[in-house]
Swiss-Prot record:
The lineage of its organism: Bacteria, Pseudomonadati, Campylobacterota, Epsilonproteobacteria, Campylobacterales. Mg(2+) binds at residue 66. It comes from Campylobacter jejuni (strain RM1221). InterPro entries: AAA+_ATPase, AAA_lid_4, DNA_helicase_Holl-junc_RuvB, P-loop_NTPase, RuvB-like_N, RuvB_C, WH-like_DNA-bd_sf, WH_DNA-bd_sf. Homohexamer. Forms an RuvA(8)-RuvB(12)-Holliday junction (HJ) complex. HJ DNA is sandwiched between 2 RuvA tetramers; dsDNA enters through RuvA and exits via RuvB. An RuvB hexamer assembles on each DNA strand where it exits the tetramer. Each RuvB hexamer is contacted by two RuvA subunits (via domain III) on 2 adjacent RuvB subunits; this complex drives branch migration. In the full resolvosome a probable DNA-RuvA(4)-RuvB(12)-RuvC(2) complex forms which resolves the HJ. HAMAP family: DNA_HJ_migration_RuvB (MF_00016). This is Holliday junction branch migration complex subunit RuvB.
């Protein structure tokens, strides 16, 4: 599903985001409580000349978990090695990564909830005792070889904290949940990013882009790049509100940040007249798989009160009817 408001990373996002990503906490906008606590923990660890405790970042995609991991690396003066759980298929894959770490390194594992139970078992002693237990052979002849590891910090990122096993979650000494951004915060991010793109973004233009970015920096920056294209074609050094509106309307992103897929989803629910629709039925109607519905379409709609998720299925809220300019009929329980 190719959507400009897609929360998951596009292949080009890595390079693009890196060029616009802040390198320290001074340049990082938003998530103030998390920044404040991390600053304290980093200062304390440096004062004791120790590694940071292991850190778990959770929350919807695109809110800055990877950026925070890189900032922690910078602030600690440590090297960071990055991987994703789907890349770690065998215990040997993880062992190779761990044995190549140096003292004080940071290991960042994205989508950590996708680690298999067998991989988690290898990770437990590495996190707790900085030790790797490798089993050689099988059956009665099997032997366990213990390999000491350098002290390191594991930073895990997940969009589905509930899928982490309790033993793994409990081994993270610091756990933070990232929240959706305010439009004012996104506007500041956009204006700073525009300067790196050799553009000036007017405040009203930045707010217009922010308003349509689903409260997510990754989407905001992606939209900014497309708006910049419209400005470049018209030989404009300043991104105006008029140009931003033109670009965003052309991209099919409305004033609420909805695209055609969101509108189809909401139209399906509102047509049901507040009768719950199951996830499988929604996926079939939209010709999408269930994971895409849950991970890509629903998080923003749920967080902003457009839909409700019940045991029987999904229901459109009064806010959805308003967004689609439809009449909302109260249920018996609401009257």
């Amino acid at each position: 599903m190719d959507r400009i408001v897609e929360i998951e990373k596009y292949s080009f996002d890595e390079t693009y985001e890196t060029s616009l990503r802040p390198s320290n906490f001074d340049g990082y906008i938003g998530q103030e409580s998390i920044k404040k606590n991390l600053n304290i923990f980093i200062a304390a660890a440096k004062k004791r000349n120790e590694c940071l405790d292991h850190i778990l970042f959770s929350g919807p995609a695109g809110l800055g978990k990877t950026t925070l991991a890189n900032i922690i690396s910078y602030e600690m003066g440590a090297n960071i090695k990055t991987t994703a759980a789907p890349m770690i298929e065998k215990s040997g894959d993880l062992a190779a990564i761990l044995t190549n770490l140096s003292e004080g390194d940071i290991l960042f594992i994205d989508e950590i909830h996708r680690l298999s139970p067998a991989i988690e078992e290898v990770l437990y002693p590495a996190m707790e005792d900085y030790r790797l237990d490798i089993i050689i052979g099988s059956g009665p002849a099997a032997q366990t070889i213990k390999i000491d590891l350098p002290k390191f910090t594991l930073i895990g990122a997940t969009t589905r904290a509930g899928m982490l096993s309790n033993p793994l979650r409990d081994r993270f000494g610091m756990q933070f949940r990232l929240e959706f951004y305010k439009d004012s915060e996104l506007a500041l991010i956009l204006q700073k990013a525009a300067l790196k793109l050799n553009k000036t973004c007017e405040e009203k233009a930045a707010l217009e882009i922010a308003k349509r970015s689903r409260s997510t920096p990754r989407i905001a920056l992606r939209l900014l790049k497309r708006v910049r294209d419209f400005a470049d074609v018209n030989d404009e050094e300043i991104i105006t509100e008029k140009r931003a509106n033109e670009a965003l309307n052309s991209l099919g992103v409305n004033e609420l940040g909805f695209d055609a897929m969101d509108l189809r989803y909401l139209e399906l629910l509102t047509a049901a007249k507040q009768k719950p629709i199951g996830l499988a039925s929604i996926a079939a109607a939209l010709s999408e798989d269930e994971n895409t519905i849950e991970d890509v379409i629903e998080p923003y709609l749920l967080a902003n009160g457009y839909i409700e998720r019940t045991a029987k299925g999904r229901i459109a809220s009064a806010k959805s009817y308003s967004a689609l300019k439809l009449n909302y009929e109260k249920t018996l329980f609401e009257e």
